């Protein structure tokens, strides 16, 4: 079976680069430093307009931080799902937990029902749930299509033992997709030792600003942004290395 590559894309242009590099799918996100948040309507619509072959999945995450949501946040998520359906994207990506660290089954069912007929991926909320094997069975019962996971570790290489067990227990009932720290120099190892067939990675490079006048004394964001005059973007040549 051909290796399926999903690119974590932070912009419409990153979606273009991912498609040019031969990726199968993108997860379109804003707020990458926060782990990914819902992109704007304009970004999603532009990504759709500029691509023709690649599947676009959109993260539905109203904020960074934990995965315990208020009703106001849930309403926002439902509206964003409706917009994604209107724009005819391929799928949506979300994950919700209870205060005790379990999958919030009623809320996930509510969101999955709202998302139909779109594909649904449970994101790395799974990696901070209390019991991954119970969560696995719950997500299968809910009709989730795939789980994005680092094996409840800081990166997918460290999570190989759990990822392999999840693939075994899933037995084709749901797709287990390793992500976080998947690189061209370790994807073969992860593939061989887990049996996974889909992989999530960023394949980004730094893009330097073309600004000539620069006032570097006035930052526009927090200290986690290294410079106002550089951004990151999917690199089609890096994508090709994973295919």
Curated annotation (Swiss-Prot):
SUPFAM superfamilies: CutC-like (SSF110395). The keyword Lyase does not apply. It is found in: Cytoplasm. GO terms for cellular component: cytoplasm. InterPro entries: CutC-like, CutC-like_dom_sf. Keywords: Cytoplasm. It holds the Pfam family CutC. The keyword Cytoplasm applies. One of its GO terms (molecular function) is copper ion binding. HAMAP family: CutC. Belongs to the CutC family. This is PF03932 family protein CutC. The gene is cutC.
